[in-house]
Amino acid sequence: MSDHGRMHSTGSEVAAPVAPDPDTEGVHPHFNRRVTSFRARRSTISDGQQATWDRLWPQLGRQARDGDEPPGPLDTDAWFGRHAPVVLEIGCGTGTSTLAMAQAEPGIDVVAVEVYRRGLAQLLSAIDRTAATEHPVSNIRLIRGDGVDVLTHMFGSASLTGVRVFFPDPWPKARHHKRRLLQPDTMALIADRLRPGGVLHAATDHQGYAAHIAEVGDAEPRLRRVAMDSADLPMSVTRPVTKYERKALAGPVVTELLWERTP
């Protein structure tokens, strides 16, 4: 797992696991019915992470689905205990960027969605560590599930100030392009969930996927491409450079793309 959130395949392209997968158990059986953008993974969390999970997950996290039942609408005001702009991050990975950006904007509530329990456990532990600091983080909530499912069922039209999708799996082989997260249907769904003036911020280090994202984003009539340094954006688009990126500075260039929801 990279520290900016991408989880890499280990071995051949993965079929459905033959035994329960502790990292995706309870998440992906339903999604065998449609093409998904995530891969099956096997991973464990430490005893310390498990203890933190047991203590904080009931308050800060929730499972998107209970079996085959679709999730219901999410009341973010009740969950966060306040009314504030909401940003949805799809595929938060280990939460390095999630935490840093939430700390920089305490007035914005961040809902971080991730399929893999290990990544969520790392983010939950990082949030817990801020409790002993001068500025404990209280504006992050976590959902374990599929991002498209969460967008479809848990958020209504014009309910989001922003959507972040950082380093989604590029699925580089042509026969797997249909598995890419940012497809025309997903772009249309994101556009519907953004309020007018809300923004979609995407980042990838795969140039082929960057071109694909740019094409499908520009083709969505309710989204207008804007520059990263545009004034009056409703949320920060200053994304922290992670350890993974620092190690890869001589490698692939990171492409960042930004769209604004039209009135």
From Swiss-Prot:
Pfam families: Methyltransf_4. It comes from Mycolicibacterium gilvum (strain PYR-GCK). The gene is trmB. It catalyses: guanosine(46) in tRNA + S-adenosyl-L-methionine = N(7)-methylguanosine(46) in tRNA + S-adenosyl-L-homocysteine. Coiled coil: none annotated. Residues 1-33 are annotated as: Disordered. InterPro entries: SAM-dependent_MTases_sf, tRNA_(Gua-N-7)_MeTrfase_Trmb, tRNA_methyltr_TrmB_bact. Keywords: Methyltransferase, S-adenosyl-L-methionine, Transferase, tRNA processing. The keyword Nucleus does not apply. It is an enzyme of class 2 (transferase). Belongs to the class I-like SAM-binding methyltransferase superfamily. TrmB family. Substrate binds at residues 173, 205, 242-245. This is tRNA (guanine-N(7)-)-methyltransferase. GO terms for molecular function: tRNA (guanine(46)-N7)-methyltransferase activity. The keyword S-adenosyl-L-methionine applies. Catalyzes the formation of N(7)-methylguanine at position 46 (m7G46) in tRNA. S-adenosyl-L-methionine binds at residues 89, 114, 146, 169. Its EC number is 2.1.1.33. One of its GO terms (cellular component) is tRNA methyltransferase complex. Pathway: tRNA modification; N(7)-methylguanine-tRNA biosynthesis. It comes from the Bacteria. Disulfide bonds: none annotated. NCBIfam families: tRNA (guanosine(46)-N7)-methyltransferase TrmB (TIGR00091). The active site is at residue 169.
